């Protein structure tokens, strides 16, 4: 039986998490860290205890025990949500499809139009996710550099500063120019759709300008020891190399360093490999269109 997670499920939830179920969902802020699933109890217990419009969970129960769980979390806006956790008991991977199909009817709880899911490219859940209505629209690669060299910010004509709310339109124009149509259709063809679909990864964001226009967008995450960066730009190889060096300088003292790269950023991949990075993981990014409520027609008096 698949149903929502309730307050009365606290005990069986802790028992389920204590068995170290496999989490197939790969959210951006946990790509480079290992989380003990028992530590996931806090946000999941919170969803049991408090009614929240930013998170909800569904469980598959058999003989009184939880066999699988999917947790959904709101992105930046209410129109887009992501699968935050997809926990499966060992040997019960077949439950994945039914659980993900249930998310297609979650609009009664989350009022969303789109749902996003990131899986390891080799995950057994990938085919089942496609069977349940998800579409694979993008592959991402995670690059790894074990030891960073001491790098100072390079001299260039680029001007960097912290991202501000006033940059939203400029960043959307950059995203639109740099991303393929297939990706934009999934993540957002309009500023509102794109803005709502972005996740809430805790990063330091920098924009770089050239001739008064935003030419690059850097997302830098500082972990306790490791660091990660992402680059969105249309720049050529020379400026891309400068952006990589700039990111490494911003992550000075962090080891190892990771870079998340979209499959269409082939030039960036070559530059990373030239600088000693190795590809360590690949991820499938999927999206699913949820049922959209259509207002029921209402009869109104006809005026003479």
Model-derived segments and spans:
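Long, hydrophobic/aromatic-enriched structural stretches that serve as scaffold segments
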Residues: 58-98, 104
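Conserved acetyl-CoA-binding loop-helix of GNAT-fold acetyltransferases
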Residues: 91-107, 131, 236-250
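Active-site/acyl-donor-binding loops of N-acyltransferases
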Residues: 122, 132-153, 257-304
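Amide-forming acyltransferase catalytic core, primarily the GNAT-like/NAT-type
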Residues: 2-63, 132-225
């Amino acid at each position: 039986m698949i149903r929502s997670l309730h307050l009365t499920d606290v005990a069986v939830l802790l028992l389920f998490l204590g068995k170290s179920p496999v989490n197939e969902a790969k959210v951006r802020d946990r790509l480079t860290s290992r989380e003990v699933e028992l530590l996931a109890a806090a946000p999941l217990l919170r969803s049991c205890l408090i009614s929240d419009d930013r998170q909800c969970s569904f469980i598959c129960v058999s003989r009184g025990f939880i066999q699988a769980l999917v947790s959904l979390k709101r992105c930046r806006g209410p129109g887009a949500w992501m699968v935050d956790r997809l926990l499966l008991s060992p040997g019960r991977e077949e439950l994945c499809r039914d659980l993900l199909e249930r998310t297609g009817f979650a609009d009664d709880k989350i009022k969303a139009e789109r749902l996003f899911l990131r899986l390891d490219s080799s995950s057994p859940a990938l085919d089942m996710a496609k069977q349940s209505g998800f579409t694979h629209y993008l592959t991402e690669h995670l690059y790894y550099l074990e030891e960073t060299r001491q790098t100072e910010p390079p001299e260039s004509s680029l001007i960097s500063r912290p991202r501000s709310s006033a940059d939203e339109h400029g960043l959307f124009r950059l995203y639109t120019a740099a991303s393929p149509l297939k990706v934009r259709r999934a993540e957002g063809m309009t500023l509102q759709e794109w803005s709502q679909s972005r996740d809430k990864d805790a990063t330091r964001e920098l924009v770089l300008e050239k001739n008064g226009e935003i030419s690059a967008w850097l997302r830098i995450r500082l972990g306790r020891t490791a660091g990660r960066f992402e680059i969105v730009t249309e720049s050529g190889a020379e400026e891309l190399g400068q952006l990589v060096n700039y990111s490494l300088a911003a992550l000075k003292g962090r080891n190892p360093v990771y870079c998340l790269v979209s499959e269409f950023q082939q030039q960036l991949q070559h530059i990373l490999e030239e600088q000693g990075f190795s590809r360590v993981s690949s991820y499938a990014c999927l999206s699913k269109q949820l049922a959209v409520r259509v207002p029921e027609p209402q009869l109104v008096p006809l005026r003479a």
